[in-house]
Structures are given as C-alpha cells and as structure tokens.
C-alpha cells in the first residue's frame, strides 16, 4: 500500500493525499455477503438528533466480515482483495473448500491465490487464525478475541498490530497498539500478521467536500457557541471558555472515563500510554 500526492493545480488538490488502491483486485463486492445500510443522519427512532456532525455522504452497503474464523480445518483460497467503505482496512474474499464464501480483514502481505487455515492445527503464517496457546511467543497478531468464540474485538483497524509477549498459566500476555499490556485467555483466537493498508494514517482529504462524501458534517467549537448550547460558550468578546468541557459538562482533557470498578481491570498489567 502506498499513497499518492497531487500537483497543486487547485486548492483541493494541494493537500490531497490518498491511497493508490494498487492492491485492490475487484470493484464489485460478493452479492451474497452484502446488505443495504440505512443512513440515520445522527437521529434516533423519534427523529431527534443524538449525534451531531453526521449526515449525507455516499450510499454504502455493509460487507459481512467474518471475525470468528470458526471454520477450523477447512482450507480457503484468497479470491480477491477489496475496498470496504465502512472501515480503514481492506477486506479479502475467501473461497472455502466446501463452497462457502466469507470476507476477512486483509492482513499486510496477503496475496490473491494464497491458502489460509484456521484452528489449532493451522501453521502460524500470515492470515491464519489460531488460538493464542498455539501461537509462538513474540509473534505479531491482530483480530484478537476477548472471549472464546465471541469474534475478534481488538486490533482491527488499518496498520495496527499487537504482540504476544508471554504466557502465564491459562492466560497469554498481549501488548496492544495503545501500549496497554493485558492478559487474555489462551483459548481465544487471533490472526497472524498485522492489518493491511498501513499507510492509511498518511492520507489527507485535501478539501471539505471529501469529508462530506464520507458523511461528516462541519464540527463547531464549543467556545464559539452561546451558553445555551455549550458549557464553554458565551462571554464578552473572545473568551477562553474556562476549563475544557464536553457538551454534557464533563471535563474534556485528562478526565479518566474508565469505570473504577470494571471487572476486566484485573487483567490489565500495564495501562495504555497517554
């Protein structure tokens, strides 16, 4: 995956940096694995706005991605690498030996025609999904389950990876992209390798219109609002707004939002980096 810059022939081209899409091999998704996505525009079932700065954007269809990788022992061939508008990573279409088709998150370095496996007997190679107890210590992994059979919950966005650092009894110690070090049950599955499209973080839309195509509306600062609209609004002339707060009045910078008595805290060995 690489990125492409443009000559500044227009203001919108000047700062535009987008992916080259050179790894994409198909432009039309598998029809049996998609369904329509209804745009809410940030409104709930009563028509009331519950999330600001959303609305518009290009029409999308949801690709059904397999995060469980529960077809153990059945080989699958990578048929295509595709673009998914609903996530930063690319997706890969697998054709299983029994005829079933599934999408997975495409790891870095995955090629069309490669054969993938999942289960305890799978080799620790890129794209294969194994229980953590069968993965060698030091291996780079992604798509990690928090509970056995639940499906991947951690490390799913473009370019991310975690590392299996050690084993302690029935748990494995994982270092996550945030810097957090935590224990996860050894029977949980993970996929070998890092998530593809690693240059996604270098991309720049270049203009406001590209954000609107993606369904993002302009975001106003709280200090330019009226007091009725935001805790930081109002004041004579240009005011600082006082202590940074969210729209609901919570401190916006430095306040810990994690519940102090959360059950899973006992599995965290080292908190994430700031």
Curated annotation (Swiss-Prot):
Keywords: Ribonucleoprotein, Ribosomal protein, RNA-binding, rRNA-binding. It holds the Pfam family Ribosomal_L2_C. The gene is rplB. Part of the 50S ribosomal subunit. Forms a bridge to the 30S subunit in the 70S ribosome. Coiled coil: none annotated. This is Large ribosomal subunit protein uL2. Residues 209-220, 244-264 have a biased composition (Basic residues). Gene3D superfamilies: 2.30.30.30, Nucleic acid-binding proteins, Ribosomal protein L2, domain 3. GO terms for molecular function: rRNA binding; structural constituent of ribosome; transferase activity. It comes from the Bacteria.
């Amino acid at each position: 995956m690489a990125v492409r810059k443009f000559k500044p022939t227009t203001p919108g081209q000047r700062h535009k940096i987008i992916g080259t899409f050179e790894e994409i091999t198909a432009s039309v998704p598998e029809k049996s694995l998609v369904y329509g996505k209804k745009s809410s525009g940030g409104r709930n079932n009563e028509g009331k706005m519950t999330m600001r700065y959303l609305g518009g954007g290009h029409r999308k269809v949801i690709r059904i991605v397999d995060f469980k990788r529960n077809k153990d022992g059945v080989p699958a061939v990578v048929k295509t690498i595709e673009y998914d508008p609903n996530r930063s990573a690319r997706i890969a279409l697998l054709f299983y030996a029994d005829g079933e088709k599934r999408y997975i998150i495409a790891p870095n370095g995955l090629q069309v025609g490669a054969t993938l496996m999942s289960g305890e007997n799978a080799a620790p190679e890129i794209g294969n999904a194994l229980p953590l107890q069968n993965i060698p210590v030091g291996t780079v992994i992604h798509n990690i389950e928090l509970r056995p059979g639940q499906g991947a919950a951690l490390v799913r966005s473009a370019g991310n990876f975690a590392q299996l650092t050690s084993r302690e009894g029935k748990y494995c110690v994982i270092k996550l992209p945030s810097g957090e070090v935590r224990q996860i049950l050894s029977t949980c599955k993970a996929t070998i390798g890092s998530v593809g499209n690693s240059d996604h973080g270098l991309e720049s839309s270049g203009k406001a219109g590209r954000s609107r195509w993606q369904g993002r509306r302009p975001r106003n600062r709280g200090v330019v609002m009226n007091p009725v609209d935001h805790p930081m609004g109002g004041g004579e002339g240009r005011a600082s707004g006082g202590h940074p707060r969210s729209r609901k009045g919570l401190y916006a910078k430095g306040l810990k939002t994690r519940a102090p008595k959360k059950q899973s805290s006992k599995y965290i060995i080292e908190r994430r980096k700031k």
